Amino acid sequence: HNLPMINGVPQKFGSEYKATDVVLDKKKKQLSMNIATAYPDNAEVEKWIRTYRLRDSSLDISDDFILKKLKNENQVNFLLWGDIDLNTAGKVKISVEGQIVELHYDKSLFTPSLETILLTDPRLSNVWGEKIFRLSLTAKKMVEKGRYVFSVKAL
């Protein structure tokens, strides 16, 4: 799904693993939450604040984090649908029925990869078709404290 692999560890399943410190600011058109609490202890994450901010021409997504220990590269994931173009470093072009958006990321921080996910569940395939894609942005450097910024813009 759309949550990061922190220190190489995925979000844990179960009601005790959930975001905390959720704040909705309607004036700023912003939603933020600490997703560190959605991960098991072996992720070694002290804080990971995911923020979504709606602007006039974009949706900005940022991750501000502090790790307790470095174990593995962080990987930020986005599930995508449509025609995907990774040919320009720092930009992912997504086209669906004549509508085009770009997801911008810092090419100096991440290496992109794309995985095809076949949908066999009719509840999903009836909506999304036979496949979706997982864009994985793998951090080039392991850092204990940092900020990742992504922006989605319509063209």
Predicted segments, located by residue:
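CBM-like, beta-strand-rich accessory domains located in the C-terminal region of large
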Residues: 1-155
